[in-house]
Regions:
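P-loop NTPase nucleotide-binding/switch module
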Residues: 1-13
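Glycine-rich phosphate-binding P-loop
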Residues: 12-41
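Conserved nucleotide-sensing/catalytic segment adjacent to the nucleotide-binding pocket
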Residues: 39-98
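Conserved NTP phosphate-binding and transfer environment spanning the P-loop NTPase/kinase superfamily
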Residues: 94-176
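Solvent-exposed alpha-helical segments within well-ordered globular domains of core cellular machineries
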Residues: 7, 31-32, 140, 144
C-alpha cells in the first residue's frame, strides 16, 4: 500500500488520478467532472494497493472519505451536495492526468503517438500531461482524456489509426 497526492475520480468507468502542483486547479477540475456525472474516489490523499502486480485500486483514507477541500469555501460533503451517485469507495486506476503550467512541460503532446507512463508500486499506468492556462476547460479535457483511454482499452487508438490513414494516403497518392 502507498499514498499519492492528488484527486481521484471515476469518469464513465475510467479511474483517473488528477495531480498537479498546489494551485494548479485540480479540485476545480474534479468539481467540474463531478458536475458532469463523475464520482469522487479521493481528494488530496489517494491510497493505492496493488492487485496481483498488474492493477492498482485507489481509495480515500476513511477520515476524508466523500469530502473535498475547496479553497475559499472550505470542506464540502460531496454526496450531500451532488447526490449519492457522486461518490465511490474505491476504483481501479486507469489513467493519470498531470495538470502543469505550459512552461513546465518539455514537449506538449500534439498527436498522441508517444505514450507516457506513471509508475506506482511497480505498475505503469498511462499518463497524460495537460497544459493549464486561463480559460481552458480542464474538466472537459480530462473527460476527453478518460474517454480516449476507454477507447484504447477497447483496442482503438485514435493517434495510431490517424497515422495509419495518413501514411496510406501518402503512399497511394505519392505525396512526399
Amino acid at each position: 500500500v502507498t499514498s499519492e497526492h492528488g484527486c481521484m475520480v471515476d469518469v464513465q468507468g475510467i479511474g483517473v488520478m488528477v495531480r498537479g502542483d498546489s494551485g494548479s486547479g485540480k479540485r476545480e477540475c474534479v468539481l467540474g467532472l463531478i458536475e458532469r456525472g463523475a464520482s469522487l474516489v479521493a481528494d488530496d490523499i489517494i491510497k493505492y494497493r496493488a492487485i496481483e502486480g498488474r492493477e492498482l485500486i485507489g481509495m480515500s483514507p476513511v477520515t476524508g472519505r466523500f469530502h473535498m477541500e475547496v479553497r475559499g469555501i472550505g470542506i464540502i460533503n460531496v454526496p450531500a451536495i451532488f447526490g449519492v451517485a457522486s461518490m465511490r469507495v474505491e476504483k481501479r486506476l486507469d489513467l493519470v492526468v498531470s495538470l502543469k503550467a505550459t512552461d513546465k512541460i518539455d514537449n506538449i503532446e500534439r498527436v498522441g503517438i508517444r505514450k507516457k507512463k506513471y509508475e506506482i508500486l511497480g505498475i505503469k499506468v498511462p499518463h497524460v500531461e495537460l497544459p493549464v492556462a486561463a480559460g481552458r476547460d480542464m474538466a472537459s479535457l480530462v473527460e476527453v482524456a478518460a474517454l480516449d483511454q476507454k477507447l484504447k482499452s477497447f483496442g482503438h487508438d485514435s493517434a495510431i489509426e490517424f497515422e495509419a490513414k495518413l501514411l496510406k494516403t501518402i503512399s497511394e497518392k505519392g505525396i512526399n
